[in-house]
Amino acid sequence: MFERRRIILIVLGLLVLALPGCVASYIYYPELDIRITPSSVGLAYTDVTVETSDGVNINAWWVPVKNPRATVLFCHGNGGNVSYYLETLKVFKRLGLSALIFDYRGYGRSQGKPSEQGTYLDAEAAWQYLTHERKIAPQQLIIWGRSLGGAIAARTAARHPTGLLIIESAFTSVPEVAHAHIAWLPAWVFAEYRYDTRRYVEQITMPTLIIHSSEDEIIPFAHGRKLFETLEGPKVFLAIKGSHNQGFIDSLSVYEPGIDAFIRRYAGGTNEVLAE
């Protein structure tokens, strides 16, 4: 009996030790291979290396347009790398936006291993690059995050008030979205990874656009609505259709005009639903 109990305790202990790694693999899906570059789709760009405050070199692409109406700091999702977002870069160009898109540590050509705090430091370094190296005024910046990047963008915007914030297909927090998929997992499993987007948006007063698909199969539509309801400042909700990863393409006829309209009136304070 004692031996059996000892074996059970050992197995449980090993499971507890293994859980952080399992959770990390649930959150991060990095791809190292850069499959294609902006020049492949006719976009001029500069390959940039930015050093974070903890000494990690991260890779980024600076993709300018002539006479930009604003500049985007784009925080991508948890999968792939910068080369997976060329369609998004094309959207930026059509909207007249210069952009810096960067890879989190452990993604693409960026050094290191991904972690929650690490991704925040990566976004901070990208912000510093735009405002110090490129000399772009904060009020001319749009911090834009998609999926996991929504939490990173919200946290960056909470620390650095800027012109606009766009949060697309994002969750309220990792524990809450994980519970929607794996209800039996206890909350403490995610103690190391919170990405508490809702807490960050509570601190934001700048005009913010929330974009979410009512057909999102990964992050429930309700998460986008909760983020919208949490915001205290000027805010707009843009409802689109389509899957989590393809919704912006499937809803392009609503997506681009909705973003354009938001940018045009960024100084306004209306709370509006642009589309259902």
Q: Which ranges hold each PLM region?
A:
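An N-terminal hydrophobic leader/cap segment in hydrolases
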Residues: 18-51, 273-275
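Membrane-embedded segments
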Residues: 53-129
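Short alpha-helix in the alpha/beta-hydrolase fold that links the catalytic acid
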Residues: 88, 197, 206, 220-229
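Primarily recognizes the serine-hydrolase "nucleophile elbow" in alpha/beta-hydrolase
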Residues: 126-133, 139-184
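Short beta-strand/loop motif that positions the catalytic acidic residue
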Residues: 203-205, 210-212, 216
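Acidic catalytic loop of the alpha/beta-hydrolase fold
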Residues: 214-219, 245-246
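Catalytic histidine neighborhood in serine/cysteine hydrolases
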Residues: 225-247
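Post-His helix in hydrolase/transferase enzymes
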Residues: 248-262
